[in-house]
C-alpha cells in the first residue's frame, strides 16, 4: 500500500524531528563538523561504531536489499560502477583485495557483475563484520586487519579495492599509501565523498544508529596523495549522490577513481 504524498511528508517530518526515531530509521543522520583530525580520533575512540553488532546487523539488512535487487537484474549505480572499475583494468580474473569489506557483499557483486569474476580477499578491522562475512561466504578469504597496517607483502594483489571505507578512516593518507604498496597493478577508490572547491573536513554522524566519523576529501588533495604514493589516475566516475552542503556549506558528491601503479625504473 502506497500512502498519499502528504502523509509521507508528515511521516518524514516526524521522524526527522525525533532523535530516537531518526537514528533508528534513517541510514545517516545527526551530522556535525569536527574541528580537527585529533577531534575525529577522539570521537572514534569514544564509540564502538562499526565494531558494534547492532550496527553491523543494520548495515547488513540494507545491503541485503541491494544484493537482492542486483540478482533481479537491477543493480544500484554504485555496484555497477564498482564492477566497471574492475573491468576497466583489462585484467582477466584479477586477484582483488577489498579494504574495509564489511560483511563481504562486494565478493558477491564481483562474482555476478565482473565477467570472469575475481580472486577475492576481504579485510576489515571489525571482527563482527568479518564474522558475518565468513558466515555468508564460507569459501571466501576474509581477515581481520587494519587499512593503515595491511598484513601483506608489497605487490601482493593485482587490484586493491577500497569500497566505502576510505571515508571512515581518519588516517586516510596512510590508508592510501598502504593500498598503493600492496597493489601490483591498480587501486580503486570507490564512492569517495569529495569536495571540488573546499578543503578536507571531518564529520561526526550516526550511521545505522551508531556514532561514527566520516571524511569528506578535497578531491585535489586525494589525487595529489595518490600521485605521491606512485599512482596515476586512469579514469573516474560520478557515483551515487551525496551532498552534505546543509552541514558543511559546500556541495559534495561521491566519485570512483581507477589508478594504475607506476612501475619503478
Give the predicted meaning of each segment.
Residues 213-236:
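Short alpha-helix
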Residues 103-148:
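Class I SAM-dependent methyltransferase SAM/SAH-binding core
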Residues 173-186:
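A short glycine-rich, Lys/Arg-flanked "PGG" loop and its adjoining helix->strand segment in the class I
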Residues 149-154:
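Short conserved loop adjoining the S-adenosyl-L-methionine
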Residues 4-90, 94-102, 188-216:
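Conserved class I S-adenosyl-L-methionine
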